[in-house]
Regions:
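Structural boundary/hinge residues at secondary-structure and domain interfaces
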Residues: 19-29, 34-168, 176, 251, ...
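Leucine-rich, highly hydrophobic segment in Treponema pallidum outer-membrane-associated proteins
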Residues: 4, 11-42, 53-57, 190-192, ...
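Short, surface-exposed, polar/charged, turn-prone segments marking secondary-structure boundaries
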Residues: 99-104, 169-170, 226-228, 234-237, ...
Length: 565
């Protein structure tokens, strides 16, 4: 049917003003639609016990993707499953906005045949594999179809609209499959950047930015040893896909580095798989990094609640808790940090100065080296907290460390550092509890007749139960010792968040977003930009919890739980 129309269409091309449909626009549109749709769904999910059935947690379109593909991302549910947010009008607004320029109507043209998967893949860094003429990345979008005939009608409709917009079309039968594509043989070269090719293969509609992308997808299907499923790294990664994952991303890290023009430094990990799982409270994003090297966790997995958390108040804005910091610098987490920061920023020091500026300032002002002066003697449980400070923009802090044989020497070392920085280390009684205070004492004179002495406490610490407790001020320590305030462990928000994290694990990083965003926006200006990009998510975010829970050799597995209203 389509070939008969092409000649008439091409004769009136010059009279048409309809804009062309560009694959980059379609890809960006689909990604945006999925992210906004899912984020909006999270909002609704927190108010209604809706469940989504995931039929298959492994992307079926992987059979079309090369084993050397840098990246593949898949939505594994039908977008209609997310349309519960239709009550807020968001889904219709987003689809109408994204597809407006394409003259494609989602309800009539796509919805009738779309099944339970949409996959986007970067298939190759350079389509013609000739770097001398520049690099042109190959992109493939695969949409699962329940009705191949209707999806073929959609494909013909899509290319008919492109023909009416002024594009010359070509049709080729490749290995038994009809491939429709933009034919730029007589067109300007720059238009190739906006080209589109498509085919219906088995139960998928394939769209690519070049006919060669579609042809290679067909090759990968017919020669299974070429496709991603035959990759040992991918096979190992898919074993880590979370149950009921609604979306999955696979990254070939060396190829991602080449694609982005980065040299993969400190290359411990060679692949990553990310899964997104919904529950009644929010979203769990689980990530697994894989390596053939031997890696070790920073500490033995913890299957019981961390006792040091009992001393953190319910109002804690940020909590970091775990065990054994002494091995952190040699752990799997440290190797991942080095690989990521060295690749992107050149080295870890540059990354720390840019991303963790507040920590750098603390080290410089106190003359500290965290690894040598603190981490080395923390071999038991620990908990670190930041608390909102109504009297100052600088938050209060708490550091709790379990008693171990190394603790006495570690405390003495910190007291010595405080003394060398000019602070007075003195003992005082606080409700019959012996406390050591780091105090900055200054004296000023008035008219040579009187002298005023001002003492500012920079930190205090004391032994309590089986822990040493450090705080930024006496008021915070007094509240802990009185045991009249509720513990963070009694905070329903915190309790619900850590319940989602698998056990055993390496501990938690817990951020109460509602209670801490003002603190971190002041300290990390980049966070404001991130918040704008993820506005649908951040608008409804209560807290986020990060944990690591690797259980198999050669893997580093962890998750981030976004708790939503």
């Amino acid at each position: 049917m389509l070939p008969e129309k092409l000649e008439n269409i091409n004769n009136v091309n010059s009279q048409q003003s309809t804009k062309n449909i560009k694959l980059p626009f379609l890809v960006a549109g689909v990604i945006t639609l999925l992210l906004i749709g899912i984020a909006g769904f999270y909002w609704f999910l927190g108010k209604s016990p809706v469940s989504i059935v995931v039929r298959n947690s492994q992307p079926g379109a992987a059979i079309f993707v090369s084993k050397s593909s840098p990246a593949m991302v898949s939505l594994l549910v039908n977008p209609d499953a997310l349309q519960t947010i239709e009550q807020k009008g968001a889904f219709s607004q987003v689809t109408n906005s994204l597809l407006a320029k394409s003259n494609i109507d989602y309800q009539n043209d796509i919805k009738p045949w779309l099944s339970n998967e949409i996959t986007l893949a970067v298939t190759t860094i350079d389509i013609d594999r000739d770097p001398e003429n520049g690099l042109q990345t190959g992109y493939l979008m695969a949409l699962a179809t329940e009705q191949p005939e209707k999806s073929r009608e959609f494909l013909e409709l899509l290319f008919s609209k492109r023909a009416f917009a002024g594009t010359n079309l070509g049709i080729e039968r490749y290995k038994g499959v009809k491939v429709i594509y933009d034919n730029f043989e007589y067109s300007q070269v720059e238009n190739i950047q906006n080209s589109l090719a498509g085919a219906v293969v088995n139960n998928f509609v394939l769209l690519g930015n070049h006919p060669q992308v579609i042809k290679e997808a067909i090759n990968n299907l017919q020669a299974p040893d070429l496709n991603l499923i035959s990759s040992l790294a991918y096979q190992k990664a898919t074993q880590q896909i979370s149950k009921n994952a609604v979306a999955v991303t696979f990254l070939n890290l060396p190829e991602v580095g080449k694609w982005q023009g980065l040299e993969l430094a400190e290359s411990t990990y060679d692949s990553q798989i990310l899964s997104l799982v919904l529950n009644s409270q929010g979203l769990l994003a689980e990530s697994t990094f894989l390596t053939n090297s031997q890696v070790v966790p920073p500490s033995l997995p913890l299957s019981q609640p961390i006792g040091a958390l009992h001393y953190l108040p319910e109002s804690t804005a940020l909590a970091i808790a775990g065990a054994n910091l002494s091995n952190l610098v040699n752990s799997d987490l440290a190797k991942l940090w080095k690989q990521g920061t060295a690749t992107i920023y050149g080295d870890s020091k540059n990354a720390i100065s840019l991303l963790l500026k507040p920590l750098v300032e603390i080290q410089q002002s106190w003359g500290l080296n965290f690894s040598q002066d603190i981490f080395s003697w923390v071999v038991g449980e620990y908990a670190l907290a930041l608390l909102p400070n109504s009297e100052n923009i600088i938050p209060n802090w708490i550091f709790v460390v379990e008693k171990t044989p190394q603790l006495v020497a570690g405390i003495a070392h910190l007291d010595n550092i405080a003394s060398t920085r000019g602070f007075n280390v003195s003992s005082l009684n606080l409700d019959e509890q012996k406390v050591l205070a780091w105090t900055q004492i200054t004296a000023t004179s008035e008219n040579n007749t009187s002298i005023n002495v001002d003492a500012k406490i920079k930190g205090v610490h004391t032994t309590f139960d089986n822990y040493e407790i450090f705080t930024s001020d006496l008021k915070t320590l007094t509240a802990i010792l009185s045991q009249k305030q509720k513990s963070l462990l009694k905070n329903p928000k915190f309790h619900n968040a850590i319940t989602v994290i698998p056990q055993p694990n390496q501990g938690y990083i817990y951020l109460d977003w509602e209670n801490s965003q003002d603190i971190f926006k002041r300290q990390l200006p980049l966070l404001k930009f991130v918040e704008v990009l993820g506005k649908p998510l951040f608008d409804n975010l209560q807290s986020l919890t990060v944990s690591s829970y690797s259980s198999e050799p050669g893997t580093l597995k962890g998750g981030i739980f976004f708790q939503l209203h």
